[in-house]
Amino acid sequence: MYLLPASNGNGFATLAGLHGLPSPFYCEHGYPGFLTWHRAYLDAFQDALCCINSDVVLPYWDWSSGPTTGVPPACRQPTYVHRNGNTVPNPLYSGPALGGGQTNRAADIDTRTFGDLATFAQTAMGNSNFSGFQSSLNGPHGSVHGRVGGHMSGVANAGYDPIFYLHHANVDRLWAKWQQSHPAPLPSSERTKELDPFYKTFSTDLMTGADVETTDQLGYRYSTFCWFLPPFVLTDLLVVKLDPDWFRIRRTTAKLIMNSSKMSSRTMDLRVFVNDSRADSGTKTLGNPAFGGSFGVFGMEVGEEMSDKAMRVGSGGQKFDLEIDISDCLEHIDADGDELSLNLVPVGPDGKVVPIKHIPADSFELLLK
């Protein structure tokens, strides 16, 4: 997004300008429109992210749940080490400022505290009507802007600091959470308020508060906890050992995701067994508590070896992900001293194990939420 020109509607500079300068200050910070306008704004930002990479989801910075100091660690360093081993600029550290250069924050931001804002946020959550909730939440929202400092401290330039979007995602999350216990419709003045410059899909009509009343209308929900194990590749043993401490957390679902960008040369049933390193092609699946599920891979089966390049061409250059839910299999690892292993057994149509080289996976990920 940073590299796209200002003339591109999905460019960072274009979207950042909608909040303040150089656009005519579209943002709403009064009533009606504060929460609804910013929800529409975040939706536009998320759509722009997806146009570049559909796997990206805008995260939120939860400054509202307890004592915190400084901005999130992911936003503190100017560089980070990419998974490929290269040190690259951190896009969450700063953004391109209006007029040139990079955005900045308060010099002592790493020692500034935000814990008291959690109390104010909880007070806001206790309001029984929308107007009171919106008014109460606006205060700590503004305090975060001020304490981050630098470009974030003024409406005109706040949108140019990437942390703006993490901050407002949390404001939006708090509203969504409040709505769960207060499902009444928005006041009429909020529902009919036009959210300039955001338009309804395939329409010349501006969106209104009624179009963003719930996150479901926009196709997303907030999770209390969401955690990714960094992508890993298969070894010759087909067994992945994971630190059990990572799983001693409260969770609702656990999904294993296979990322791929190429066709498979072989058709296979890639079976996943949890904490059963001895599982093989003959291990039963039905009624087996260690069986997490399987990835059904439909391969070329052309009777000859295919090069990696040919398999990628065969996929049409598209990426695809397959996932299975292994939540039930992870219930037993809460016990102290337990370890977790994932044994991936590729079984061909003939019932025999398929060599690991034929598995068309770029990487695997484990998602807990």
Predicted regions and their residues:
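C-terminal accessory segments of proteins
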Residues: M1-K369
